[in-house]
């Protein structure tokens, strides 16, 4: 199969993975309209083509949180990545390190912080959820820091899990889920051998101490649902700011007032995100929410964004809307599931090439020059 875009990686992932895993990557909340709008609203952003601008040298590199990187891109925290490919977090981290972009490890990863650091020998970002057990959170922060995590991405848009109907239909949850998953795995023998057999252990590495012997998928889902903390407030983040000495990024912000609150508690950045449309269906797409947030706090925080990014062209669009950098989640998960580390490497190379083409054809030579002036029309601010 020829792979030349994220769409191709998605199809290859669909063919390889059991349905419950593919739908877990591919699905969203409720009717999945916000998930679709993430893609559609970003694709509708028209760029202003310029000519005769001397774009003989185009440089897509940038600096985020004091670190120079090859692209204004980071691999977003994606849960259960080690189930998409054998020790998937390690494969993705190696690909990111080789390209010179950050990899962000999810709290709910198969490979833990120490295994990822050993695999890539490069500092990484770490993502943390809001959990009831503050002692466990403190221990996890300490482990991540000791393993070399430099930037903490604190996810705040999951006080409760979203309603993901597709998961119930596919066997990730719902009646007889375990039996349905076994049948689906048997129908995908290449995945079953490579990941199901050779990819052990399948425990959730970072939360294994809390789970104890109960480390199966259903155990994990139940533990996570029971440990989300809906009572947390902005004032509760002070101890996280005090505990984490590196850059702190608040992920899951869609409103300028929340972005201002993040700045007020001492955060270094925010991620404009609706969790890939996996939490509350009907909220703004990231592309629509981004400009107002960039206007409100762009001089106080590093504004990042995710949601609907499928190409280097989409990265340029997000930067033009006000982001300093972009997190890529589903796109790299598809690539990883399809071809492992080589797939993620190929995806990042595609994004690099697509960014360079888009920059050249809009007349910009460096990332700092990408702003609203390359848009064909002024984008209205939400709110």
UniProtKB/Swiss-Prot annotation:
GO CC field: plasma membrane
Q: Looking at the Swiss-Prot or TrEMBL record, what is one Pfam family this protein matches? A: FMN_dh
| Reaction(s) catalysed by this chain's protein | (S)-lactate + A = pyruvate + AH2
Domain FMN hydroxy acid dehydrogenase: residue ranges: 1-380
Q: Name one GO molecular function term.
A: L-lactate dehydrogenase activity
The keyword Flavoprotein appears for this protein: yes
Q: Where in the cell is it found?
A: Cell inner membrane
Q: Which PROSITE patterns match?
A: FMN_HYDROXY_ACID_DH_1, FMN_HYDROXY_ACID_DH_2
EC no.? 1.1.-.-
Cofactors, names only = FMN
Active-site annotation: 275
Please state the span of the N-terminal signal peptide per the UniProt entry: none
Role played? Catalyzes the conversion of L-lactate to pyruvate. Is coupled to the respiratory chain.
Protein name as annotated:
L-lactate dehydrogenase
Q: Which gene encodes it?
A: lldD
